[in-house]
Swiss-Prot record:
The gene is AGP26. Residues 109-136 form a propeptide. O-glycosylated on the hydroxyproline residues. It is a lipid-anchor; GPI-anchor. Its main location: membrane. This is Classical arabinogalactan protein 26. Residues 40-53 have a biased composition (Polar residues). Coiled coil: none annotated. The lineage of its organism: Eukaryota, Viridiplantae, Streptophyta, Embryophyta, Tracheophyta. It comes from Arabidopsis thaliana (Mouse-ear cress). Residues 38-95 are annotated as: Disordered.
Length: 136
């Protein structure tokens, strides 16, 4: 069985090698073969736009873009109010910093629930139990 698998993989690799060697890959250059000249009608300055297509930008002294009183009553206004306080910047509640017993909470949040001696004893007992079960 292993000889037939080896033969199949060998034949397959030879077929793939001969089929890929027949292809010739061509490369495409990103640079154009020639650079076209700029049209003679192109000028350095931008052409002036007609008044109907030119954008209307507000100027500091003009009131053309300000809405009329009838439009301003239709447009909703956003009330300026203070944003809510940052919860990180708010001083913490002193009652929450004390544990139920009354002593302050430890600096780290990890608390060892089982002592190292007890955990090593449990580990030894577990290994003995596994060894005992493997005999039966």
């Amino acid at each position: 069985m292993s000889v037939s698998l080896f033969t199949a993989f060998t034949v397959l690799s030879l077929c793939l090698h001969t089929s890929t060697s027949e292809f010739q890959l061509s490369t495409i250059s990103a640079a154009p073969s020639f650079l076209p000249e700029a049209p003679s009608s192109f000028s350095a300055s931008t052409p002036a736009m007609s008044p109907d297509t030119s954008p209307l930008f507000p100027t500091p002294g003009s009131s053309e873009m300000s809405p009329s009183p009838s439009e301003s009553s239709i447009m909703p206004t956003i009330p300026s109010s203070l944003s809510p306080p940052n919860p990180d910047a708010v001083t913490p509640d002193p009652l929450l910093e004390v544990s139920p017993v009354g002593s302050p909470l430890p600096a780290s949040s990890s608390v060892c629930l089982v002592s190292s001696q007890l955990s090593s004893l449990l580990l030894v007992l577990l290994m003995l139990l596994l060894a005992f079960c493997s005999f039966f």
